[in-house]
From Swiss-Prot:
Ranges facing Intravirion side: 1-27
Main location: virion
Protein purpose: Important virulence factor of HSV neurotropism. Seems to be required for glycoprotein B-induced fusion. Dispensable for growth in vitro.
Virion surface topology ranges: 49-172
Full protein name: Envelope protein UL45
Superkingdom: Viruses
Transmembrane segments: 28-48
Species the sequence originates in: Human herpesvirus 2 (strain HG52) (HHV-2)
Length: 172
């Protein structure tokens, strides 16, 4: 006599989950790994190099650093047209604020001088008198003045991002 069951021989306690839903897809793990890896890379770039490596780029050959810019000059006085055309791109004539600051720094030599500097006047003929750092338009200066070329240096967006994170974390 054979044993025969009246119902199914095996009844699962819970319905079977499909194997595709039970596991996290490999694509998701790759995505999470890429995000974590990118975060670790940015963290290493921010934390490992010293602050000095995130500074401004050096000035080109023949140029002197001046605050956040670079300056070059020719001590021979020239006319305005020569001064404007004598600065190679991306440099222009020194802006008025930077010229006043430079004049204040060189005031010791300037007190004995009655010279003038051409300054960037956005197309208007403008100069700065060295003795008292007064600037003007065709009012009091001679036809000749010294040309000082200037170009600003600014850090890129990623450098500003890194330095802001380092500042927020209080890192030196």
């Amino acid at each position: 006599m054979a044993f025969r069951a009246s119902g199914p021989a095996y009844q699962p306690l819970a319905p079977a989950a499909s194997p595709a839903r039970a596991r996290v897809p490999a694509v998701a793990w790759i995505g999470v790994g890429a995000i974590v890896g990118a975060f670790a890379l940015v963290a290493a770039l921010v934390l490992v190099p010293p602050r000095s490596s995130w500074g401004l780029s050096p000035c080109d050959s023949g140029w002197q650093e001046f605050n956040a810019g670079c300056v070059a000059w020719d001590p021979t006085p020239v006319e305005h047209e020569q001064a404007v055309g004598g600065c190679s791109a991306p440099a222009t004539l020194i802006p008025r604020a930077a010229a006043k600051h430079l004049a204040a720094l060189t005031r010791v030599q300037a007190e004995r001088s009655s010279g003038y500097w051409w300054v960037n006047g956005d197309g208007i003929r403008t100069c700065l008198r060295l003795v008292d750092s007064v600037s003007g338009i065709d009012e009091f200066f001679e036809e000749l003045a010294i040309r000082i070329c200037y170009y600003p240096r600014s850090p890129g967006g990623f450098v500003r991002f890194v330095t802001s994170i380092r500042n927020a974390l209080g890192l030196p």
